[in-house]
Design a protein with these regions (language model features):
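Transmembrane alpha-helices and adjacent helix-loop boundaries
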Residues: 1-378
Length: 378
């Protein structure tokens, strides 16, 4: 019996890697085939049909109301229209929640490193308290102990004559739907793009000037802001933007909870920067704010972004807890449709595909950002 030669392809490292990946792929395919075959057999045994055609069937209306609907919807619409409402509601929470959580997390993270004893201790108490209590419990607190305890709409709390707060939600000023508003928005978008471009070119004065002229001024005077107003006929509040108590609860809960984890990520990233960088920047006469903005934070970003991506993904997945407080996101509406139609498998596939798509988009975006801020070794 002869031993295999060392130069055999079995000992080729490239072949071993490819062979291992092929084996793993085959195993995954076999697992999917096994469960798919079981699904088909069970559907046939129970004489059930599989398909998504019912979502678009106009003869089968959704027949249920959706309280928080940002787009036009009625119970006579199709199930697909109801799903679209849930999708928009989920996007509202995800986008605004990620933006607010990152902003609050950075502030709290910097507070954890503050030289002020009181600020540092308050930030520490916030992080340790929020991180060590369940998110669902926090949502119940915000909903049942805060928003539902607010006054009725007739006795709304009023702030500066422009903001109203009651147990049905929050009412805020909002731009009117007019040509002037859309023109101002277009100018603001161009101003933001120009400011980002100038900041990348290290032209700070031009960047601040473009922000002032093309963003701040149109924001204050260009947009036709409409403030909420109490209707004396029916005691309702008209105009402005209405954020329901369910939406506000979920947004606050997700923001506060996720920001606690982001704060620790930011703190760890900043502390990973060599202490000599601080001392060198201070020796050049830079103020602490400039040291953080120009020297420390850019070096901390490559450390911060990977775990920050995980926290953004967790926020997206945690948003499915909306069903616990009655907010109609994609998961809540899918559950209602599954109960009415018996299409539980199809709706589960829709929900899984939706969250998978959102998470893949976030992952790809954050990976691109991570490549941009990566420190290039010479």
């Amino acid at each position: 019996m002869t031993l295999p030669q060392k130069n055999s392809f079995w000992y080729d490292e490239r072949f071993q890697k490819i062979f291992l990946q092929v084996i793993i792929l085959l195993i995954v395919c076999l697992i999917f085939w096994f469960f798919g075959r079981n699904l088909v057999i069970n559907f046939q045994r129970l004489r059930l049909s599989f398909g998504f055609g019912f979502l678009f069937d106009s003869d089968r209306p959704a027949s249920f109301a959706i309280g928080d609907s940002p787009i036009a919807y009625s119970p006579t619409d199709t199930y697909f229209r109801a799903l679209l409402v849930g999708l928009v509601n989920s996007l509202r929470i995800m986008i605004s929640g990620i933006f607010l959580a990152i902003s609050l997390g950075i502030v709290i993270g910097l507070g954890r490193l503050s030289d002020n004893w009181l600020i540092r201790q308050l930030a520490t108490i916030y992080v340790e308290t929020i991180r060590n209590t369940p998110l669902l419990l926090q949502l119940f607190f915000w909903y049942f102990a805060v928003f539902l305890k607010l006054p009725k709409i007739e006795e709304s709390l009023e702030f500066f004559g422009r903001v109203f707060l009651n147990n049905s939600g929050v009412y805020l000023p909002f731009p009117a739907n007019s040509f002037r508003t859309w023109l101002a928005l277009a100018i603001m978008i161009l101003g933001i793009i120009l400011s980002v471009f100038l900041s990348l070119k290290n032209k700070l004065i031009l960047c601040l000037t473009s922000l002032l002229i093309l963003v701040i001024i149109p924001l204050i005077w260009g947009l036709q802001w409409q403030s909420p107003q109490v209707n004396p006929l029916n005691q309702n509040i008209d105009f402005g933007l209405h954020l329901s108590s369910e939406f506000a609860t979920l947004l606050i809960g997700l923001t506060v909870y996720t920001a606690a984890f982001i704060a620790e990520t930011v703190r760890g990233g900043i502390q990973s920067v060599n202490r000599g960088q601080w001392e060198a920047a201070k020796a050049l006469g830079l103020k602490p704010l400039l040291v953080m903005r120009l020297v420390i934070f850019p070096q901390a970003l490559p450390v911060i972004i990977p775990p920050l991506t995980n926290e953004c993904l967790n926020l997206v997945k945690n948003s499915s807890l909306a069903i616990a407080i009655g907010y109609n996101d994609i998961y809540a509406i899918s559950s209602t449709i599954a109960n009415q139609t018996g299409k539980a498998v199809e709706m589960l596939i829709v929900v899984m595909a939706t969250y998978l798509f959102f998470n893949l988009v976030i992952s790809l975006t954050m990976n691109q950002l991570n490549q941009r801020v990566k420190i290039q070794e010479r």
